[in-house]
Structures are given as structure tokens and as C-alpha cells.
């Protein structure tokens, strides 16, 4: 059975950037890495309803700069900036260095892999049929301008006795093309029957000359579906 490399990891330094940017010697590397994991877990827990896609962490000159990519910046910032200021104070205490927080809004959440995976998982937890949830997400992404999208769900789908995997795809998802800008994300849906895994691949175009091809809305391609 063929195994696939992580679509983001293989493209780091080509069309994808690292989410943690800092340098550490051998003594501090593990501490920095552990601190990053704790910061991300803390923010994901605090901002569950804020549609957070990605958290970037940089450590320039004895400070920390955290960039939160979210589709709902108002929830992160709070009334008159109270919520984001409290986050900054908590993170400064946790990391032990001054923290600066930047908020970046995601203009098209339908084209963000993590937000699409979260949306599908939330629908599965509300007992929406998995085929309907996948089809709706695929249609929305293609309507906004994705070149291709694939969604896969695995587990006890519909409460079945035996776990299985099903997927739905439209357009192209060229995993072997390194210049292809593919957004990949995974998420878990916790249902009464157990955990259902959700994987999303979104092909946004090829990066040529340092910029991605302009995304244009297009008509949906013929449906392609299969199951294992």
C-alpha cells in the first residue's frame, strides 16, 4: 500500500513557510519547541469559536511575535481590544518574554484547509450526513475559485459497525508537483460513535515567479467519488 508524504512538509522552503521561525542551540531547542506547542494548545483552547486556521510564532531578539490567522478577528480582539490584551498578558507570563500579537483576517475561509476541515467535523458532530457535509464544502471551495479539492473522512461513518474511509474530489489535486500551492489540514470529529478523522487538500494554483496564479471562480467539474 502506497504511503504519501505530508503535502505541506515537502513544500517547506518552496511554496510554504514554517509556522515557527527562530534559532536555538542544542540546549534550548527542546524548550523552545515545547513552549511553542503549549502556546498553540492554549490559543486553540481559548479561541475555539474564532475559526483559527494557523498560529505563527517568531522569536526576534528576546521577544516573541505571535500571528493568529483567523476568519473572525472580532472575536479574538474583543470589545475595545480587551480580549487580545488579556491574551498578550497571559502569553507573556507563560513564555517569560514580551509578546506581541498580530491578527490576520482570512478573507476566504472556504479556501482554507483547516477551516474547511473544522466545518466538516462540526457538521458531523451535529449528525449531518457525511456525504452532504463533504459535497457542500467541495462546492463552496470550487465556487470561490479553488483549482481542486479533495475531502476524506474515516471512521464509523453514520454509526456503522465497521469503520471505513470515503472521499470526494473535484478538480485537480497534483500532490507530486512541488510548485503547486496545496493547503492540507486534518481535524477530528468527536461523535457518539467514536472519533471520525477529516482530511482536506485544497489546490489553489501553481506558484510561478514567487506568486500564486490568480484564483478565479469557475463552474464545478463533474463529480468524482469513490470509497474503500
From Swiss-Prot:
Cross-referenced SUPFAM superfamilies: Prokaryotic type KH domain (KH-domain type II), Ribosomal protein S3 C-terminal domain
GO molecular function annotations of the record: mRNA binding; rRNA binding; structural constituent of ribosome
Domain of life: Bacteria
Any Pfam family hit: Ribosomal_S3_C
Cross-referenced PROSITE patterns: KH_TYPE_2, RIBOSOMAL_S3
Gene Ontology cellular-component annotations: cytosolic small ribosomal subunit
Alphabetical list of InterPro entries matching this protein: KH_dom, KH_dom-like_a/b, KH_dom_type_2, KH_sf_prok-type, Ribosomal_S3_C_sf, Ribosomal_uS3_bac-typ, Ribosomal_uS3_C, Ribosomal_uS3_CS
GO BP terms, alphabetized: translation
Keywords: Ribonucleoprotein, Ribosomal protein, RNA-binding, rRNA-binding
Subunit (UniProt): Part of the 30S ribosomal subunit. Forms a tight complex with proteins S10 and S14.
Function as written in the Swiss-Prot or TrEMBL entry: Binds the lower part of the 30S subunit head. Binds mRNA in the 70S ribosome, positioning it for translation.
Family: Belongs to the universal ribosomal protein uS3 family.
Protein name, as recorded: Small ribosomal subunit protein uS3
Protein species of origin: Ectopseudomonas mendocina (strain ymp)
Amino acid at each position: 500500500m502506497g504511503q504519501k508524504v505530508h503535502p505541506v512538509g515537502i513544500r517547506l522552503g518552496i511554496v510554504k513557510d514554517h509556522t515557527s521561525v527562530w534559532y536555538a542551540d542544542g540546549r534550548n531547542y527542546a524548550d523552545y519547541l515545547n513552549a511553542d506547542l503549549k502556546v498553540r494548545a492554549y490559543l486553540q483552547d481559548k479561541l475555539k469559536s474564532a475559526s483559527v486556521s494557523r498560529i505563527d510564532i517568531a522569536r526576534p531578539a528576546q521577544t516573541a511575535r505571535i500571528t493568529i490567522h483567523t476568519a473572525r478577528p472580532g472575536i479574538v480582539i474583543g470589545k475595545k481590544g480587551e480580549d487580545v490584551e488579556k491574551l498578550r498578558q497571559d502569553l507573556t507570563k507563560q513564555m517569560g518574554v514580551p509578546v506581541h500579537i498580530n491578527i490576520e483576517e482570512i478573507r476566504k475561509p472556504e479556501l482554507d484547509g483547516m477551516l474547511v476541515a473544522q466545518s466538516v467535523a462540526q457538521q458531523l458532530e451535529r449528525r449531518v450526513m457525511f456525504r452532504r457535509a463533504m459535497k457542500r464544502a467541495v462546492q463552496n471551495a470550487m465556487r470561490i475559485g479553488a483549482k481542486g479539492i479533495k475531502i476524506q473522512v474515516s471512521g464509523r461513518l453514520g454509526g456503522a459497525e465497521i469503520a471505513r474511509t470515503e472521499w470526494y474530489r473535484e478538480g485537480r489535486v497534483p500532490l507530486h508537483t512541488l510548485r503547486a500551492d496545496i493547503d492540507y489540514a486534518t481535524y477530528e470529529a468527536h461523535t457518539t460513535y467514536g472519533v471520525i478523522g477529516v482530511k482536506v487538500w485544497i489546490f489553489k494554483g501553481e506558484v510561478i515567479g514567487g506568486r500564486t496564479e490568480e484564483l478565479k471562480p469557475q463552474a464545478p467539474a463533474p463529480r468524482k467519488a469513490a470509497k474503500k
